[in-house]
C-alpha cells in the first residue's frame, strides 16, 4: 500500500497540503485545544472560532502587506462560501451596485430632482455602463459569460480575447496592452476583471494589468508570489490550491467599495433598473459587517488556512514576507521548464514562453500523441508521481506546482521527464523507463 511519503501529488486542485498541517489537523478534529470537542464541532460564534478567524486575517495581512486602515486606503478580508465560481457572480452584483451608487451620487449632486433620479439612471445605465473582461483562459471566459448572463452582453466589454491572437484559436498568449480595447472613461467602467493564473491553459500574468476598478481572480497562484494589493479594488481566491481545503473563498475588498464609504443602493432601485440582486450570502457588505459570520462559516477550513499561513510566515526570511515561498515556486518551475525545453522536441509547452505559468505547467507529449501521453502518465504513476493528467477540456499533461509540492517532488519529476524523453528519443513508447 502506498504511503504519503511515497506519493508526490501534482493535481490541479484540490491540491496537496503540508503534511505537518494535516497531522495537526488529525488531532484537533477530535479534540481542539484540550477542550474535549473537535474543531469541526465548535460554534462558529465561539471565542475559539473568533480567535481562529482573527489569526487567519492577521497572517494574510502580514504575508501580502494588506493595509488595515478603516479609511479609503484600507482593505477588508472576507471568508465566504461558493468558491471562485460564486465570486464570478458576487463581483458583478457588487461592482454594478457600486457603479449605480456612484452614478446616483453624481446625479444628485448635479441637481437632478429626486423623483427623476431613477429615470436618469436608466438612461445612463443603458448608454454607459461597461464591465471590462480580460479573457486569457477558460476561467476568465467563464467569468465573462456569467457577467453577460446577469447584466446582459451589451454591458460586457471583452477587452481582449486571447484566442484571437494565436494560431488555432486557442488560449496561450496575453497580447500587449496597446492592442486591448479598454473602457477609457472611469465613470463608465464598473470593473476590469482578470484571472491572474489560468489553471486549464497554463497562462499567468507576469505583471498587474492596468484598468479601472481592478478585480482579480487569484485562486490558483494566491500566496505564491508578492502582489500589489493597493492596485486592486478586489481580489479573491478559492482556498483549495495554495492555502487550504475546499470550502472557503477568501476575498480582499477595498474599503472604498463598502459602507460607510459607499452606501449601497436600495434593492428597490436595482429592481427598477432591471439589475440583478445577489444572494445575501454573496453580499460583500453583509459579510463584512458580520465579520464573515453572517451564516455558518466552516471554521475547520479557516483553521487549516491559518496554519498554512503560519508556516509561510515562519519560513519567510525576506521582505515582502512571501518572498521565500516565491523563490521556491520559481525554483521548481524553472527546473521543470528546463527539462521540458531540453527534451529535443519530445515535450512541447502549450502556452507562449512569455506567459508560462509557474503554477500549472501544461504540456503535450510528442505533439499530443495519445499513446505517448498515455505511456508518460503510466510511467509517472508507477513512480508515485500522481495527478498529472491534463484538464478534460484540453487533454495532455498538466504539472501543478502549488506551494505544498516540495522541491524534492519537483526534482523527482524532473528526473522522470528527462528519462522518459531519452527513452522516446531511442524509440521507446511504453513508459517503462
Where are these regions (language model features)?
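Conserved active-site segment immediately N-terminal to the catalytic lysine
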Residues: 215, 229-240
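Conserved PLP-anchoring active-site segment centered on the Schiff-base-forming lysine
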Residues: 98-139
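Conserved N-terminal alpha-helix of the aminotransferase class I/II PLP-enzyme fold
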Residues: 35-90, 94, 106-117, 146
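Active-site phosphate-binding strand-loop segment of PLP-dependent enzymes
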Residues: 147, 158-222
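N-terminal "arm"/small-domain region of PLP-dependent enzymes with the aminotransferase-like
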Residues: 1-43
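Active-site C-terminal subdomain of aminotransferase-like
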Residues: 239-337, 352
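Conserved PLP-binding catalytic core of the aspartate aminotransferase-like
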Residues: 347-380
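PLP-dependent enzyme catalytic core of the Aspartate aminotransferase-like
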Residues: 7, 382, 391-433
Amino acid at each position: 500500500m502506498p504511503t504519503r511519503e511515497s506519493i508526490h501529488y501534482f493535481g490541479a486542485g484540490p491540491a496537496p497540503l503540508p503534511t505537518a498541517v494535516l497531522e495537526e489537523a488529525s488531532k484537533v478534529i477530535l479534540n481542539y485545544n484540550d477542550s474535549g470537542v473537535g474543531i469541526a464541532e465548535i460554534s462558529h460564534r465561539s471565542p475559539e472560532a473568533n480567535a481562529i478567524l482573527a489569526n487567519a486575517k492577521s497572517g494574510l495581512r502580514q504575508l501580502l502587506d494588506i493595509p488595515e486602515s478603516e479609511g479609503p486606503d484600507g482593505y477588508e478580508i472576507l471568508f465566504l462560501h461558493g468558491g471562485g465560481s460564486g465570486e464570478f457572480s458576487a463581483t458583478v452584483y457588487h461592482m454594478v451596485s457600486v457603479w449605480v451608487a456612484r452614478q446616483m451620487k453624481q446625479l444628485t449632486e448635479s441637481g437632478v430632482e429626486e423623483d427623476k433620479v431613477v429615470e436618469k439612471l436608466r438612461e445612463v445605465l443603458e448608454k454607459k455602463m461597461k464591465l471590462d473582461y480580460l479573457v486569457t483562459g477558460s476561467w476568465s471566459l467563464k467569468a465573462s459569460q456569467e457577467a453577460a448572463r446577469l447584466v446582459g452582453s451589451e454591458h460586457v466589454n471583452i477587452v481582449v480575447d486571447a484566442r484571437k491572437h494565436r494560431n488555432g484559436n486557442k488560449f496561450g498568449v496575453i497580447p500587449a496592452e496597446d492592442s486591448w480595447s479598454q473602457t477609457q472613461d472611469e465613470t463608465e467602467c464598473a470593473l476590469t476583471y482578470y484571472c491572474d493564473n489560468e489553471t486549464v491553459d497554463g497562462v499567468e500574468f507576469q505583471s498587474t494589468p492596468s484598468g479601472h476598478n481592478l478585480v482579480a481572480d487569484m485562486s490558483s497562484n494566491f500566496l505564491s508570489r508578492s502582489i500589489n494589493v493597493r492596485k486592486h479594488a478586489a481580489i479573491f481566491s478559492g482556498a483549495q490550491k495554495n492555502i487550504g481545503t475546499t470550502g472557503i473563498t477568501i476575498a480582499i475588498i477595498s474599503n472604498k467599495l463598502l459602507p460607510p464609504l459607499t452606501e449601497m443602493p436600495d434593492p428597490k432601485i436595482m429592481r427598477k433598473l432591471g439589475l440583478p440582486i445577489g444572494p445575501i450570502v454573496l453580499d460583500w457588505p453583509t459579510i463584512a459587517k458580520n465579520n464573515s459570520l453572517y451564516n455558518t462559516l466552516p471554521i475547520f477550513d479557516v483553521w487549516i488556512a491559518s496554519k498554512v499561513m503560519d508556516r509561510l510566515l515562519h519560513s519567510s526570511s525576506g521582505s515582502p514576507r512571501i518572498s521565500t515561498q516565491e523563490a521556491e515556486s520559481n525554483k521548481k518551475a524553472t527546473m521543470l521548464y528546463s527539462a521540458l525545453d531540453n527534451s529535443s522536441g519530445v515535450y512541447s509547452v502549450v502556452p507562449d514562453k512569455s506567459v508560462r505559468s509557474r503554477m500549472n505547467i501544461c504540456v503535450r507529449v510528442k505533439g499530443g500523441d495519445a499513446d505517448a501521453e498515455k505511456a508518460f502518465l503510466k510511467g509517472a504513476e508507477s513512480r508515485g508521481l500522481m495527478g498529472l493528467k491534463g484538464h478534460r477540456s484540453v487533454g495532455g499533461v498538466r504539472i501543478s506546482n502549488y506551494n505544498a509540492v516540495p522541491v524534492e517532488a519537483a526534482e523527482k519529476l524532473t528526473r522522470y521527464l528527462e528519462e522518459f524523453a531519452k527513452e522516446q528519443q531511442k524509440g521507446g513508447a511504453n513508459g517503462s523507463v
